[in-house]
């Protein structure tokens, strides 16, 4: 289901075609934010299909949010944090684009699964407010217990984050 910032509210079917909104409540991942119909069909649909095709992510991810720069955030059901994937790969060829999006999602979510299993299970599900998976081989997490105000230096803000390196998908 798509609820875009521009007011559009619709569903995508299995063929990536737009369907009108209905009053039926469905158990789907909702996508919000800076989404036009082309982006929904070409990027959100393969992203959500990849998430829904995995039992863990089908149960854990409840929302996809697209930022103005087209970066993608995921909102999980468990844990009070946001997961940032980064910007999805862009290809003009539809088949290459779909394959690249699925590969992108699988690589990021494999890293997140390991982090959930070996990191958050030890540190606590609510330790971090933001988990950034944008960069390969590292996960950057913003700790919840530190707030940045306007007078705080960049060094103090960075000290409020944890960088976990060498996190690769197998």
How should each PLM-predicted stretch be described?
Residues 1-170:
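Charged, solvent-exposed interaction patches on well-folded alpha/beta domains
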């Amino acid at each position: 289901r798509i609820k875009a910032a521009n007011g559009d509210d619709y569903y995508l079917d299995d063929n990536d075609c737009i369907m009108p909104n209905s009053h039926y409540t469905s158990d789907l991942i909702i996508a919000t934010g800076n989404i036009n119909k082309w982006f929904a069909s070409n990027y959100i649909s393969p992203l959500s299909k990849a998430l829904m095709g995995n039992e863990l992510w089908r149960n854990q991810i409840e929302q996809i949010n697209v930022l103005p720069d087209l970066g993608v955030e995921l909102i999980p059901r468990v844990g009070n944090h946001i997961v940032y994937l980064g910007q999805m790969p862009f290809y003009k060829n539809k088949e290459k684009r779909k394959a690249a999006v699925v590969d992108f999602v699988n690589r990021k979510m494999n890293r997140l699964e390991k982090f959930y299993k070996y990191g958050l299970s030890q540190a606590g599900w609510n330790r971090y407010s933001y988990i950034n998976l944008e960069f390969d081989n590292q996960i950057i997490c913003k700790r919840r217990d530190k707030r940045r105000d306007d007078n705080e230096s960049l060094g103090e803000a960075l000290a409020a984050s944890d960088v976990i390196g060498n996190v690769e998908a197998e």
